[in-house]
Amino acid sequence: MRSVTSFNDSWVFSEASTRDAERSGRVSRSACRTNAVELPFNYFDERCYQRAFTYQRVLAWRPDFSQGSRSSSTRQWPMRSCISTAKRSSRIRDGYTPFEARLTDRLLEGDNLITVKIDGSENPEIPPFGAGIDYLTYAGIYRDVWLKVTDPVSIANIKIETRDVLSDHKAVSLRCDLSNPQGLSFSGTISALLKNAAGEVLAEVAGETTGQSLAFEMDGLRGLSLWDIDDPVLYVIEVELRTGQGFRLLRRAFRLPHGEFTTEGFRLNGRPLKIRGLNRHQSFPYVGLRMGRTAKGSAHADIMNAHRLHCNLVRTSHYPQSKWFLDHCDRIGLLVFARNPRLAAYRWGGMETGGNPERPPHRSSATGTTRLSYIWGVRINESQDSHDFYAETNRLARELDPTRQTGGVRYITDSEFLEDVYTMNDFILGNEELPGANRPGTALRPQQECTGLPRKVPYLITEFGGHMYPTKIYDQEQRQAEHVRRHLEVLNAAYARNPGISGAIGWCMFDYNTTRISAPATGSAITASWTCSASPKFAAYVYASQCDPSEEIVMKPVTFWARGDDDIGGVLPLIVLTNCDEIELKYGSLTKRVGPDRENFPHLPHPPVVIDHRHFTKDELGVWGMKWESAEFTGFIAGKPVADLRMAADPVPTTLQVEADSKTLRREGRDTVRLILRALDQAGNVLPFLNDAVDIEIHGPARLVGPARIVLQGGSGFLAGVHGRRRHASSRSRRRGSAAAKLDLVALADGAASA
């Protein structure tokens, strides 16, 4: 391989028609913006991006373009694009899977104008369109672009499979596919090294090739560690191709896990593991899908797993997601349920399911062959049955990777079961409120009621909650407490001593912009445990509190601590989401210590503490018109205090906090970091109903994403800046003063070789 370099920078953009761009020959820089459309936070017309746009960039001739090399532009998921140079063009009718546009023999000496024409309109022949969908498909080049210069014969792909991972002598199967578009005659050598994280060579194989793919076996491997959620050990396969025309080196990280869904639940490396996860959309305020590597990669994965939510699985909704996010999931020990892009017409039964082998499920499956998640979604989300089509998607997935189980997400009962795992969106909780409902509130239905099968099968809940009880971060306290209780009830049912359920994946992680067929008035779905501006709702702590205290001690009272927020008045019953043994509440001169509510939530690893009139009488906490006091909460483990929290009776704005997801940004390409603003009271708690405006300033060679003045929602706000050499962001509110965050640029160059 000669080089793979970032091709993200120096693009100019035009809202002019593609015909106008071709006529002018080049888009004027003074007339362009970085984004096709910058969306308001809410209340916007989704049709604003459903039209044609043009991106252009000059590629200067380089000597290595002519030395028998092949040049191509690799794009990760632009929405339905046509790429052209002065000589020819390439076309892709898919917004979700990566592709290469070959530039070999198209480049001229001198400056070459690369034109990318984006069609953001909804075409029913292109997934996911065809009927209604409940998310937005933002137009534009919203992920990374690479310029790849290779030898005429190069490595096209590495496919890695692991075998016998539970034995002392493990095995790795490797297939190396070659790219030789000119059909050149050659002979060469392919060698492969297996290395650990320290770079030590653990195994080596080699073979001769005259153009065909080569398969290798590395067996009898001793001393290799299994990848685990608590110990995510990664290994590297390094493949080198040497021919008379040169050589190419390709590296691919992989892991050695053993995950299996059984009728007795999910087992990871031979031990039972109850899945606790959330679905994740990858959109952001203002820019949709167009965020840099740090923001859409490590930041989201860390929230899911390591720092905030302590989930062990993420389900990608409803499309293939950023390579950077998936790579980081591997690094931090987060399981992934991979998805195909949803073709809405299949859900509503409005499209024939006959077979073009290059339809998107094929492309998505092929893209994921080296992504060692434990289950593939080979069924279009919540679609009707289609025997021939889904028999083919299952066959294809098993052919591409026989080591991985398949799953098919449905919401209909008694559905044809063609996959290895029956995956079900169970939204039964809340149906008791519908007219004519004749069953009481039910957290989850028994497996066989949903499958209609006479036997138990591997079974996983892939969605629950969500639209059944939409909740805003600034909703009244009792609604938020009910939101919390519903998540608790479903997780409690999933953890019940019923091994037939492998676990449950809630809907969803972040609020997101969606279409009007399912959106609330603002246009943003409020169905998540976090806001779209990355602020946790109370329900987020349902998941966080289930972690072991050795990972993090969690104590979150589900209250704004005010007498007048709840109906009738007061704060009881008061849920405290915690993994502590006991919670002590001090109110005035009174102190009460309460343990977990195992009566109502007997199966959770860490049931919540529920403080009610069994612990405080009406007179002890006072009634309307009596003095309202501040509260102090203390968490105890093994009789020792481990957490404390004070909630003020008279909260006032005191501090404006600025927190960055990362203190570093990458130099190469386009990177973005999220900054979260929070208005805090004198006790350090967020002021949930403060909606003041905050002014933002960015100092240095960086750019603010979104408006320079934001209004706090739920006591918090969101902004993001695209990187420069060094940046300093500050914010100011007239009532609360100012706060600042400083970010420095660092040179972190990794991942390019796998583009």
From Swiss-Prot:
Root EC class: hydrolase
Domain of life of the organism encoding this protein: Bacteria
One of the GO BP terms on file: carbohydrate metabolic process
UniProt keyword list: Glycosidase, Hydrolase
Catalytic activity: Hydrolysis of terminal non-reducing beta-D-galactose residues in beta-D-galactosides
A GO MF term: beta-galactosidase activity
Keyword Hydrolase: yes
Active site (record annotation): 382 (proton donor), 463 (nucleophile)
Annotated S-S bridges: none
Known EC number: 3.2.1.23
InterPro entries: Beta-gal/glucu_dom_sf, Galactose-bd-like_sf, GH2_Domain-Containing, Glyco_hydro2_dom5, Glyco_hydro_2_cat, Glyco_hydro_2_CS, Glyco_hydro_2_Ig-like, Glycoside_hydrolase_SF
Oxidoreductase is among the record's keywords: no
Family membership: Belongs to the glycosyl hydrolase 2 family.
Protein name: Beta-galactosidase
Annotated source species: Rhizobium meliloti
